[in-house]
Regions:
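C-terminal, active-site-flanking charged/polar segments
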Residues: 143-160, 361-378, 390, 394-406, ...
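C-terminal accessory/interaction regions of large nucleic acid-associated machines
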Residues: 469-476, 482-798
Length: 798
């Protein structure tokens, strides 16, 4: 072990023999010549300098970390570590362009590629081409053997085609990253077999500035806090950064920001990493800048390779894992992940060493999310499923940005704690097997999105959320490269769901959708939809053929959860696109019910075509083709499996407040052919039911489990004066209270006659022949959009 004392400055001008360890209390500065330094571990208490920001190192420097005893622990940082313990680490290699894009498409088997900008790249450099298909493993590494302008000759042919065009307005030019740098920090060659690589770690009081550096065989498999580059509990770190560097063949993440704020992570390239790659750890990390970074092939841990998730969500890894919204995430590219491109995984409060109840990420306004690109993953942008504070398992997460995030008492009070709209700007996403965008929460806005070739473009599990000024393409000119076992389109294109299900019918006829309504109130304004048409698909041999359906607009397929009848479309434009497709869904089978798949919400699908840009009928509703939602005045459009109706629609909620299981329940509309809608309840909850109803109509409610002691009926998504009539079988004297006020002064009286009941404002009921007749009517109060009746079998619902 070599110790450099505090009062000594050393210039390294020769490559020393391998060291057991190196403690730098003074200064160690690399001379301007090719040098190698090898040690089990290096600890910087003073200063280690390889180049400076003003004078980058232009020779070749290689630092190899060799520690092989996993039980060794140097100052809490283990071994095989370049650690910074209150010192200064300056690593500055030659400034080089970190990544570019293809200038044109490149076929499989090609040995030449044309890129937008190759200045500064050299023969002998290693580069990585990102996948431009659904499979992130179509990324491939090559070595440059010749350069002519912006044309690169590679050492061997490409195994996959790589797309290089702007197609239908969506930029799908594949990224090409430079892996080679002249300053290298690496784990030794044994790291490749053991997964026990090197790592760089800065502790509190340290300063770390890295630029133009190559990190390879770094990170330590399955080990917490052992990542290629890691700011650990540093706190305020303005002026510190990692820029224009490369990280590849990482056994555990890429760049970790842990309880550290003010960092700059700019222009880096990361390739082939296990677990979340660009990683903000606890949820207390703020004011960090992530700009112009590229991440290619973010892998889930493979148990067969001895890999385990460090935290539970590594099983679904994100190229960018963001745990606090108050950061700047700008112009980055997530180019292929087994999980997610950009995941805002917000905990309720920070976790781990940062745990506190004074910080509320789920209610903090968004810093910036703009100009980012995601492709070749399952999901592109995910704002949901943040870590549970105790288990770190993903949980349903509502992102509700507020002016005062810590005001827990008024988190939904707009007057006292005004919302702050979170704008996700100019996002490009293509080739996702799931969603390009999935948001959960309220007061979100997606503006300027450009999406293509996704199973689903946009789903908002939200309210007060809109998509605006955007473009969504179903099938683009990027046809990809189906594997020989995959189903594919008749035109040869790869599919987001290319596999067969065990039951026989292939999963690929899962219809692609552009904008998917769910929850609500949500909608879109000024959005263009292109190329949403049915597509014949077949297996590789062509023996099995079917049709994959498509619709620019749809609903979350077969959801059992509640929806909002005010969901809306405005300013839609369609080019070669079926405007709507709502897949048929009959009543659930016993097997589906055993899995909580009632599809109650989906079977009530409705949205409002505000300006007629979808249906040609301004202000009309588009509803699922179900008799309960239609009457003879509606226009049924079979190719949509939907009807266009001029009625107003609302939602009726039916709840057993006294806890009895009453399901399934049925509603019969008392007109026409008396159509019936049966409900089995929200998943595994036979006490709460929801149905889409036509305003002003009469319905009969029957519960197979009998009526509960206290039944709550709520009409919502309405306006003052809206009503429905409701009849239900009832014996005995009812105690009925209006709008949540359970008091005898608010108990409904029985009308003197059926006519008086019909004409009432909702403050009377009628009983006759074993039937109870109710009128759910919204009071004439500004802003009121609901009406409630509690029907009880005893005084004051006791």
């Amino acid at each position: 072990v070599v110790n450099i004392p505090p009062d000594l400055g050393v210039v390294l001008d020769v490559s020393p023999p391998p060291l057991r360890g190196l403690n730098i209390y003074g200064v160690l500065r690399f001379d301007r010549k090719d040098l190698e330094l090898s040690a089990d571990w290096i600890m910087v208490h003073g200063r280690l300098e390889v180049g400076t920001p003003q004078e980058p190192f232009r020779q070749r420097a290689v630092i190899t970390l060799t520690g092989n005893n996993p039980e060794e622990d140097q100052m809490g940082m283990g071994t095989k570590v370049l650690g910074v313990m209150g010192g200064v680490l300056e690593l500055h290699g030659e400034p080089r362009r970190g990544w570019t894009k293809l200038a044109q498409s490149t076929p499989r088997g090609a040995r030449e590629i044309a890129v937008l900008e190759a200045s500064g790249w050299r023969v002998g450099d290693r580069i990585v081409l990102a996948s431009t298909d659904y499979d992130p493993r179509q990324a491939e590494v090559r070595t440059i053997v010749a350069i002519s302008g912006n044309t690169l000759t590679l050492d061997r042919p490409l195994d996959f085609p790589h797309f290089g065009e702007v197609t239908f307005g969506v930029d799908q030019r594949g990224e090409v990253g430079l892996l080679s740098r002249n300053v290298v920090v690496q784990g030794d060659e044994a790291s490749a077999g053991s997964g026990f690589g090197g790592h760089i770690m800065a502790m509190m009081g340290s300063v770390m500035r890295i630029s133009g550096v190559e990190l390879r065989r770094m990170g330590q498999r399955n080990r917490l806090a052992r990542y290629p580059v890691h700011w650990h509990l540093v706190g305020e770190a303005r002026g510190q950064y990692i820029k224009h560097s490369s990280i590849h063949e990482s056994f555990n993440r890429c760049i970790t920001i842990h309880a550290t704020s003010g960092l700059e992570v700019v222009g880096n390239v990361a390739y082939d990493a296990v677990g979340h790659c660009y990683f903000l750890e606890d949820g207390a990390e703020t004011q960090n800048l992530l700009e112009g970074n590229l991440g290619i092939l973010t892998r889930r841990p493979e148990a067969s390779q001895g890999e385990q998730p460090v935290i539970p969500t590594d099983k679904n890894p994100a190229t960018f894992w963001i745990t606090h919204p108050a950061n700047i995430v700008r112009n980055n590219v997530a180019a292929g992940s087994d999980g997610v491109g950009f995941w805002y995984a917000l905990p309720e409060n920070p976790t781990g060493p940062s745990a506190t109840t004074t910080i509320w990420p789920r209610r903090t306004p968004l810093g910036e999310f703009s100009g980012n690109v995601a492709h070749s993953s399952w999901d592109g942008l995910m704002v949901d499923r943040g870590p549970n504070r105790d288990t770190l398992e993903p949980e349903t997460t509502v992102y509700n940005p507020r002016t005062y995030p810590a005001d827990t008492q008024n988190q939904y009070n707009d007057a006292v704690n005004p919302p702050v709209v979170a704008e996700f700007k100019n996002f490009t996403a293509y080739k996702h097997r799931g969603n390009a965008i999935w948001l959960r929460g309220l007061n979100h806005k997606v503006v300027g999105a450009r999406l293509a070739d996704n199973a689903i473009g946009v789903t908002f599990a939200s309210r007060a959320t809109t998509l605006e000024d955007s473009l969504i393409v179903g099938d683009s000119a990027n046809k990809g490269f189906p594997r020989n076992w995959e189903f594919r389109g008749a035109d040869g294109r790869s599919l987001p769901r290319p596999w067969a299900s065990g039951a026989g019918p292939i999963q690929d006829n899962f219809p692609i959708r552009g904008f998917e309504f769910y929850d609500g109130k949500v909608g879109f304004r000024n959005v263009e939809f292109v190329n949403f048409q049915p597509l014949e698909i077949h297996n590789a041999q062509g023996a099995y053929r079917t049709v994959r359906e498509a619709g620019a607009l749809s609903y979350l397929r077969f959801t059992s959860f509640d929806i909002d009848s005010r969901n809306f479309a405005q300013g839609a434009r369609f080019t070669n696109a079926k405007a709507v497709y709502l897949p048929p869904r009959p009543e659930p089978t016993p097997e589906e019910l055993s899995k909580g798949q009632s599809a109650d919400g989906y079977r009530g699908s409705v949205f409002i075509d505000l300006d007629g840009s979808v249906s040609g009928r301004r202000g009309h509703a588009v509803v699922l083709n179900h008799p309960f939602l239609l009457d003879t005045s509606c226009e049924v459009r079979p190719e949509w499996n939907a009807g266009v109706c001029g009625h107003g629609y609302a939602r009726l909620h039916i709840r057993s407040e006294s806890g009895e299981n009453i399901g399934p329940v049925s509603l019969t509309r008392e007109d026409g052919g008396r159509p019936v809608f049966r409900m089995w309840g929200a998943p595994n909850n036979p006490r709460f039911f929801g149905a889409t109803v036509i305003k002003g109509r009469a319905y009969t409610l029957e519960a197979s489990g009998g009526l509960p002691r206290r039944l709550r009926l709520r009409l919502e998504d309405s306006e003052p004066g809206d009503f429905i009539h409701l009849a239900l079988p009832y014996s005995g004297e009812p105690y009925i209270y209006r709008d949540y006020w359970i008091d005898n002064s608010n108990r409904l009286a029985q009308a003197a006659s059926r006519a008086e009941f019909e004409a009432s404002s909702g403050d009377r009921y009628w009983s006759e022949g074993g039937w109870l007749y109710l009128k759910l009517r919204v009071k004439n109060e500004v802003g009121r959009d609901w009406a409630v009746l509690d029907v009880c079998s005893s005084d004051l619902c006791r």
